[in-house]
Amino acid sequence: MDEYTGFAEVYDELMEDVPYKEWSERIISIMRDYDIKDGLVLDLGCGSGTMTELLASAGYDMTGVDLSPEMLEQAKLKKESSGNDILYLCQDMRDFELYGTMRAVVCVCDSLNYILEENELKRVFELVNNYLDPGGLFLFDINTVHKYRDVIGDMTIAENRDDCSFIWENFYDEDKAVNEYDLTLFIRNENGLYEKQEETHFQRGYEYEKVKQLIEESGLGFVEAFDGEETGALSEKVPVSKDSERIFFIARECTKKV
């Protein structure tokens, strides 16, 4: 079954503990350090548009790209509510096309972990590089092998919420470094009845050195990386370690002339 179909309806409710505000503060702080205080910014793998909205409200001219029409419908509902002028495009990040270049590209909340092959991840990096202004920034996070193998691998989570209940089963493939998670959702409809929906998602963990290598092979310049769980604007950048579950990377376009 397609990813983020029924899940899109309840995604924000299930992800309510994700620290989007803190992540946005860190991203905005970094961009301002590089004198990117406004202008065109792409949210790649934007999902339901939470990060896109936060950056738009901070004064950036936002474009959001996502593969799921259902998730983009949720993003557009937020856009209608906020009044922010955001362009949403339904595209695969492995072959996305834009109308021009961006001052920065952001990609957060595990979006790149859906890329299961190294050559495809490199292709995403190459496309990002192509659509960055000279000296533009690429800010992204990615979950590690350690997180899938040692923290959530083979874990089952079940919860009841106001409008839905879910069972989230994880199955980790050591050979491929791929985590399969099967979602069984029970979503309350307008009649008060619960409809059962099932989805299967696959995410791959990546090691720090491999991601750094692919950044450089794509033509981007690696700037720095740090533990992605400490992402508030004023928090200390914690170095990457073997226990890091999420790594935040900063890369930069470094070959185009102004």
Regions found by a protein language model. Give the residues of each.
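A short glycine-rich, Lys/Arg-flanked "PGG" loop and its adjoining helix->strand segment in the class I
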Residues: 122-134
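Class I SAM-dependent methyltransferase SAM/SAH-binding core
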Residues: 42, 49-95
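A short acidic, Gly/Pro-enriched loop at the edge of an enzyme's catalytic core
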Residues: 97-104
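Residues lining the SAM
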Residues: 108-110
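Conserved class I S-adenosyl-L-methionine
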Residues: 1-37
